[in-house]
Every structure is written in C-alpha cells, then in structure tokens.
Amino acid sequence: MALTLLEDWCKGMDMDPRKALLIVGIPMECSEVEIQDTVKAGLQPLCAYRVLGRMFRREDNAKAVFIELADTVNYTTLPSHIPGKGGSWEVVVKPRNPDDEFLSRLNYFLKDEGRSMTDVARALGCCSLPAESLDAEVMPQVRSPPLEPPKESMWYRKLKVFSGTASPSPGEETFEDWLEQVTEIMPIWQVSEVEKRRRLLESLRGPALSIMRVLQANNDSITVEQCLDALKQIFGDKEDFRASQFRFLQTSPKIGEKVSTFLLRLEPLLQKAVHKSPLSVRSTDMIRLKHLLARVAMTPALRGKLELLDQRGCPPNFLELMKLIRDEEEWENTEAVMKNKEKPSGRGRGASGRQARAEASVSAPQATVQARSFSDSSPQTIQGGLPPLVKRRRLLGSESTRGEDHGQATYPKAENQTPGREGPQAAGEELGNEAGAGAMSHPKPWET
C-alpha cells in the first residue's frame, strides 16, 4: 500500500506525515530530470517542497518519489494526480483528520485576525488544561501566557481597507463605511497612540496611505484624531449642513407617490440635515410632521389626525408616523375594494330605491316615537351641566375619531334608517354640546 509506505518512510526519517507526500506510478524510463520537471510543474505553484528520495515499487513496477512539504498539506488545493509521462501520477498523502482540519482552519483564521493560539487560551482560561486535551503543537503556546505579557500588536480586530480611489476595488470600503468602523473600534483599543496610528495606517491603501505618510513625515507626533480629521477634510462629504437643510426643505412628493413612500425617501435627508445642527430628537419629529403637512396632499382623515398631533405638540417619531400612515393607506385600499364590490347595476338601484321609500314610510311613526323619548330624556342629561374642559376634550376626541370612522359615510344607509332624521338630530347634538342647550326640538312626523 502506498499509504503504508508513506507512513513507514516518515517514521524512518522522523518526519511529520502531515508535511509529506508520495508520488507513485512514475514510469521506469523517466529520468531524474523529467521527474524534477514534472513535480515542479505540478506542485511548485501550490506550495514549497523538497524531494528527499526515490525508490522502486514492485507492486506496480514503477518508481515512487518521497517529497517533504514546507507546511502541512492543504487538502483544498493539493491535486490527487499530476500529469506526467505515461499518464497521470498519483499523489498520496495522509488521510484528512477532522481535528487536524479544524486546527488548520483555526490557525488560518487567527492569522488573518492577527492573533494566535496563545490569545485563544488566555481568553478562554485554558492555561491549566491537561496536555491530552490539546494538540502537541498548541501546548507550548498555551503554557506561555503566564510567563510573558502580550504584545501590543496582538488582541485587536483589523480594520477594513480604504484606499481613497474614486471607484473602490473589491475588498475595499467607501469612506463613510470605513470611518464608521474606525469610530466604533477605536475606543476598544487599549493601546498606546503609536500602536493606534500603526493599526490605522495598516488599513489604508493608495492615495489615502500616501497622504497619511506625508502627514506623518511632517509631524511625527500626529495623533489618530488628527489623522481622521485630515481624511474627513479630503475624502469626507463636502456638503455644508445648510445645503442639506435646504435640500430637505425643497423635497416634495412625486406625482402619484404614496405618503409612506415619500416618508421613506424624506427620512435620510432629514437625518443628514440635522446631523450637525443643534436640534433634539423631539425637534426632529416636529420638523418631520410639519413638513408632511406642508408638502403632502393627503386624505382629510389623515390630515385631521396629523394636525391634531401638531396642535397638541405631540409629534410622533418616525416609526409611529410610518405606522399611522400605512394604517390609513391600508384602510383606503380596503375601502376602495369594498366600493367596487358594492356598486349595483342601474336596474338594481331603482328597485332598491323603491324598497327604501316603502320601508321609510312604514318606519316613520317608530322613528317619531324614538325621537320623542330621546327628547324627553335629553334635558335631564344635559341640564346637569358639563365642565368646559370636558366639553373641549370631547370635541377633540370627536375630531380625532372622526378620521377613524370616515369610511362609514361611504357605506349604503341601512334600510330602516330614514334619510331626514340624521341631519336635525346631529345638528342638535353639536349645538347642545357647544352652546349648552338643554333640550332638543321634536322631529316632525313624515308627510306621506
């Protein structure tokens, strides 16, 4: 077996089998130069190696080459066969071990993050773990933390890359995204100013790095804050906050645009306008509400609700306002669908009209009796008197709820409801609430 030969060879030469491979199936007529060229073409682009020896295998009547690798076998890139004279030559390596694969990925991850196994052991408190629980190569690093302090170049999360070019390359960030990450991570770094500056320069490429090198050459003691201020002046947004405010104030809804869609488009402009302004969150909410009332054409119900909030000085925040607007839009859509479903044909309208008039004439005496009973009881209710504050609250409550019930007026009237009874009764109720009237006039019977 080729694998057994590989293991025996590694034991005989005291080598790690994870850093060795065996190439078998080499024809006997291949010279040493041909073998070297073939192995170089197949392995050199992938990893550094060294040929340690050759031998003859009686099982397949071919030669075998034993090769030492500079690093452990990378199973993702190493081919299982390489093209050579007489066909493909088989590459034999030690089978993949799940634990070895995990440690390999962990090492690559820690290398990219600028950390090591020592940092992991210190963070997890694993310095006193038994030797059999860790790999032999990891143990010297795990035992070292109590003996030597960590370096400043360790224990940090690397920043994203920023170059300052007009079109960022793949893997690079825009200045706004890069600056946001720097502002978030910088306070976490408990290191000296020199180390912070080194880490900052480590994330720069292209024109941004050239500018920072010039600034550092002119001032060796330049701080990270000064570096960021310089980058903001060069690559940051040049727009003044007054221009942002003007752009916000000039923003209007497009033709046919929903109120909720316009609010989504307006919010980034508002946040940008107030970013550098001395305005509180409450002022921002009030500005948003007043701008919608001034610029947007909306339904009377929605406008009544928003104007009531404006008058009371209780502006909703962005999420509350969005919920209010979308609920109103959903109600309008539902109302439109119901209107389309309830549209009768011309013949049906005539029949329903005759039926309504017939039922109205029958129900008129009953309506008169009900109105008289309400008229007799109304003085007792109103003459007790209501405080003016309660009356104003009821008026505000009626104004606020009128928008919520505005859809009821669009539905057809009930068949047993007379068309002439609503007007006087409603007018009398409003008059009694506003002027404190003690009684209501009796409605006259219907004339047939």
Curated annotation (Swiss-Prot):
<dbReference type="InterPro" id="IPR048271">
    <property type="entry name" value="PNMA_N"/>
</dbReference>
<comment type="similarity">
    <text>Belongs to the PNMA family.</text>
</comment>
<keyword id="KW-0539">Nucleus</keyword>
<feature type="compositionally biased region" description="Low complexity">
    <location>
        <begin position="352"/>
        <end position="361"/>
    </location>
</feature>
<dbReference type="Pfam" id="PF20846">
    <property type="entry name" value="PNMA_N"/>
</dbReference>
<protein>
    <recommendedName>
        <fullName>Paraneoplastic antigen-like protein 5</fullName>
    </recommendedName>
</protein>
<dbReference type="GO" id="GO:0043065">
    <property type="term" value="P:positive regulation of apoptotic process"/>
</dbReference>
<dbReference type="InterPro" id="IPR026523">
    <property type="entry name" value="PNMA"/>
</dbReference>
<dbReference type="GO" id="GO:0005634">
    <property type="term" value="C:nucleus"/>
</dbReference>
<dbReference type="Pfam" id="PF14893">
    <property type="entry name" value="PNMA"/>
</dbReference>
<feature type="region of interest" description="Disordered">
    <location>
        <begin position="335"/>
        <end position="448"/>
    </location>
</feature>
<dbReference type="GO" id="GO:0042802">
    <property type="term" value="F:identical protein binding"/>
</dbReference>
<dbReference type="InterPro" id="IPR048270">
    <property type="entry name" value="PNMA_C"/>
</dbReference>
<feature type="compositionally biased region" description="Polar residues">
    <location>
        <begin position="363"/>
        <end position="383"/>
    </location>
</feature>
<feature type="compositionally biased region" description="Low complexity">
    <location>
        <begin position="426"/>
        <end position="439"/>
    </location>
</feature>
